[in-house]
Amino acid sequence: MAGPAPPVADELPGPAARRLYSRMEASCLELALEGERLCKAGDFKTGVAFFEAAVQVGTEDLKTLSAIYSQLGNAYFYLKEHGRALEYHKHDLLLARTIGDRMGEAKASGNLGNTLKVLGRFDEAAVCCQRHLSIAQEQGDKVGEARALYNIGNVYHAKGKQLSWNAANATQDPGHLPPDVRETLCKASEFYERNLSLVKELGDRAAQGRAYGNLGNTHYLLGNFTEATTFHKERLAIAKEFGDKAAERRAYSNLGNAHVFLGRFDVAAEYYKKTLQLSRQLRDQAVEAQACYSLGNTYTLLQDYERAAEYHLRHLLIAQELADRVGEGRACWSLGNAYVSMGRPAQALTFAKKHLQISQEIGDRHGELTARMNVAQLQLVLGRLTSPAASEKPDLAGYEAQGARPKRTQRLSAETWDLLRLPLEREQNGDSHHSGDWRGPSRDSLPLPVRSRKYQEGPDAERRPREGSHSPLDSADVRVHVPRTSIPRAPSSDEECFFDLLTKFQSSRMDDQRCPLDDGQAGAAEATAAPTLEDRIAQPSMTASPQTEEFFDLIASSQSRRLDDQRASVGSLPGLRITHSNAGHLRGHGEPQEPGDDFFNMLIKYQSSRIDDQRCPPPDVLPRGPTMPDEDFFSLIQRVQAKRMDEQRVDLAGGPEQGAGGPPEPQQQCQPGAS
């Protein structure tokens, strides 16, 4: 963004030039200071306008311009305009390197790394943050070193978190992570530990609290839930020490999440209640709804379905107030499960239909399929559906086309309502990284998203066929037979004779179509067969010589003229006025600050690892809402269990020997799963 070109100082008399530039410098600095004041007050949008005006005016003071770039980048970052933030942080980095400002280069590298992290470019972000760390260590800046360690930990944490959720979408059990994901999260933990050690040495309690919180979150993703609770308790203590209610609320919520995976549901409920209380003090309705959602699911695990329904209703009301359709749909799904567990299928059907409607509106295909199955089951139980197969088949066909495996609809009646009873029992698992089996007597419920130990017994457990069971078809067992559009037949003898005759006559015309060359033309062709290198450059359409060395000489000669075009021009920086004084400064200090070979080798190394990531499109992003918690472990469990729905259902045999008896005995103990 180039501003209006000011008069050149050499074109004006000396005193006039000095007065003009003095007024412009004062104007630029005043605008920048006002923008800084507004940003500190939280008015980033107006602050950006003042900073942009300062850039339009321009300045010849390189330090001032670098500070403006840094502030503009930070302001755009807080406005979530990360593309503009990246642009100005790059300007800041280039200018700092040009003038030889090592501390400015370190800060610009850190800001650039944070912006790249938010954009999901984790490998590039790690390179920038590592450069921040190396310069801080070189300059003996302990505070900058601590910040760099924290930023590198954040980069690996964000990358590991994204990879771990992708692994969960692939039915990877929580805590059982692929080696690359575990390695990434362990790196994050290592840098957080180094940061914690350094800020303890510096006596920075606030930074210690942040390190403890992030260590707890990292160990939570690694499945080390006991260690996670230890770190979150430290975070909670420091938050109380500073009176930081928001951090205290986050610590309580994280402690609740970890205790759910430890199987200590009663302890988790107490932490969630404190989260709810603090969210009301902070007047944050979205966080209040998240706490109600977590409490509702926790009381479902405790088999207190009345209280679970109460909290889910609160979640539903707040989601409706905030127009959060995703949260509304999840609340309706949870309420349907709760009312089924209480033996009230009529109310459950109402919420299941509402869940189906919302899932269709927001385009949640998985939620829509789950809702259709729940509606079909409840209608069968209530005797309201006469032909379930005919009514559900057209709807499920679309899912089969999308690649989803259709789920079998059970033939239920009022007499077999007790088959929906799923045992649920909490077994405390001590310091284990995952919860154990939760089995025991329970009231009626649709399958709930609860973890199963049998799912963790081994990677081959799911593939082993069960004797006597009717396992559903897998996609690998399905073969699509495409009918041929035509049947090949052998050509007749007449056709063969025709083609032979055609080939014979056509071949005799080949030489007639060639262009004969006379002696003069042949000599000219020989003369131009090996043109000089200069001729080749002047005539790019000429064919290259087969000689390898000349070919590469041609490439080198052509490419050499483009090197200067690829260099960064300092004069293109917005707001920079180049004068005789700072032009010499730029020339004097710019060249030695070019990044070395080690930096580019590291950059190439990290860039090369992203090639495979660019080959396939990212998975579909599940819809999220403000009233749904970020660490929605119940959704995680639901995704893990989603492909096991058919294995958790009970097949009703249709043999005559069971016609007069009660419901048949299931061949497999039903485990709680996603509905």
From Swiss-Prot:
The keyword Repeat applies. The modification Phosphoserine is found at S413, S445, S469, S471, S492, S493, S545, S569. Expressed in intestinal cells. Residues 391-412, 424-492, 610-630, 644-675 are annotated as: Disordered. The modification Omega-N-methylarginine is found at R421. Residues 364-487 are annotated as: Interaction with STK11/LKB1. Guanine nucleotide dissociation inhibitor (GDI) which functions as a receptor-independent activator of heterotrimeric G-protein signaling. Keeps G(i/o) alpha subunit in its GDP-bound form thus uncoupling heterotrimeric G-proteins signaling from G protein-coupled receptors. Controls spindle orientation and asymmetric cell fate of cerebral cortical progenitors. May also be involved in macroautophagy in intestinal cells. May play a role in drug addiction. This is G-protein-signaling modulator 1. It comes from Homo sapiens.
